């Protein structure tokens, strides 16, 4: 019971943090009405998954902006080796998670992790069936994700290279299908644990759990927040670190970069928590997620507040 209470407190804190960030004014738009078209134009310039870039490219965006943001980017630059941008089309969280996870498996060749997540994928399939989803509505999405898992493991005729992984992630027919896989998995977990998620959903949108899943989870192009991240992390058993880039400062006036680790439910002791340390790190700016690459020798927790 205490663990559940702690989880609720953590989720409430994250929800408040994200809401505060979303309330900030960003960019150089002259009015709120200008922002949607501006964002669409900017999004179209970025592929679904971009190239890996140095953090200096992020700093260049804010040279004439907030000194606090520039200071925070300096902190990020000391902790992270690069950033990979994703298209800001409402699917950026899922695309970032997709590429970061598959990239990790391709580089690590962690067959035990592939075996583990396949078990969770099968549980997610049964969850959807038990909820009344018909197989034809989601089966193709599940099959394509499992195919990618098999193809990134080396040693078979179907094995793919790193460049091919990038190409597939930029291929709409592949990328969108995997995003839909994640959306179904997320919706299934939210519906199954409706009692847990309901307070956060009603607090954000005044919608029921069913309405929220139908309008804000399952459709392509709908943005993700802490509810989606928690559900996907728990369903697949994959920890996710989200680093927040905002204008906030410490009570003392200093500058820190806050992050939150979404640790899958069921992690109850320090040994398990250490074993499940996030290998996926995402950067959150208002309404958008990109991928961050930690420097191998850096302990992020030393200088980045949790």
From Swiss-Prot:
Annotated source species: Arabidopsis thaliana (Mouse-ear cress)
Q: Which Gene3D superfamilies match?
A: Peptidase C65 Otubain, subdomain 1, Peptidase C65 Otubain, subdomain 2
Designated name of the protein: OVARIAN TUMOR DOMAIN-containing deubiquitinating enzyme 1
- Record keyword Hydrolase present: yes
What top-tier enzyme class does this entry carry? hydrolase
Note the SUPFAM superfamilies from the entry. Cysteine proteinases
Which InterPro entries does UniProt cross-reference here? OTU_dom (IPR003323), Otubain (IPR016615), Papain-like_cys_pep_sf (IPR038765), Peptidase_C65_otubain (IPR019400), Peptidase_C65_otubain_sub1 (IPR042468), Peptidase_C65_otubain_sub2 (IPR042467)
pH dependence of activity: Optimum pH is 7.
GO molecular function terms noted in the UniProt entry: cysteine-type deubiquitinase activity; K48-linked deubiquitinase activity; Met1-linked polyubiquitin deubiquitinase activity
Q: Which UniProt keywords apply?
A: Hydrolase, Protease, Thiol protease, Ubl conjugation pathway
Q: EC number(s)?
A: 3.4.19.12
Could you state one GO biological process linked to this protein? proteolysis
Q: List the disulfide bonds.
A: none
Name the residues annotated as catalytic in the UniProt entry. Answer: 89, 92, 259, 288
Summarizing activity control, the record says: Cleavage activities for 'Lys-48'- and 'Lys-63'-linked ubiquitin (UB) tetramers is inhibited by UB aldehyde and N-ethylmaleimide but not by the metalloprotease inhibitors 1,10-phenanthroline and EDTA, and the serine protease inhibitor phenylmethylsulfonyl fluoride.
Q: Which family does it belong to?
A: Belongs to the peptidase C65 family.
Listed under catalytic activity are: Thiol-dependent hydrolysis of ester, thioester, amide, peptide and isopeptide bonds formed by the C-terminal Gly of ubiquitin (a 76-residue protein attached to proteins as an intracellular targeting signal)
Query: What biological function has been recorded for the protein in this entry?
Result: Hydrolase that can remove conjugated ubiquitin from proteins in vitro and may therefore play an important regulatory role at the level of protein turnover by preventing degradation. Cysteine protease with a preference for Met-1 and 'Lys-48' over 'Lys-63'-linked ubiquitin (UB) tetramers (e.g. Ub2, Ub3 and Ub4) as substrates.
The OTU domain covers 81-295
